[in-house]
Amino acid sequence: MSGREGGKKKPLKAPKKDSKDLDEDDMAFKQKQKEQQKALEAAKANASKKGPLVGGGIKKSGKK
């Protein structure tokens, strides 16, 4: 490797792969994943509306 050839031989970005044809199983799997993601987002939204689950209990003072 001479001084003129310095640097990386590979390009920084890899060429994009061709999108493969999805069969029915893949489509069903992707649809199921989307539904699970939506359910998770809805659960997060509901959880953020309410306060903390544990609010009471023994409170410790800063003194010893």
From Swiss-Prot:
Keyword list, A-Z: Coiled coil
Basic and acidic residues compositional bias, start-end: 27-38
Short name of one Pfam family: TMA7
Biased composition (Low complexity): 39-50
Coiled-coil residue spans: 27-50
InterPro entries for the chain: TMA7
UniProt-annotated stretches for the region Disordered: 1-64
Composition skew (Gly residues), residue ranges: 53-64
PANTHER family: TRANSLATION MACHINERY-ASSOCIATED PROTEIN 7
This protein's name: Translation machinery-associated protein 7 homolog
Source species of the chain: Drosophila melanogaster (Fruit fly)
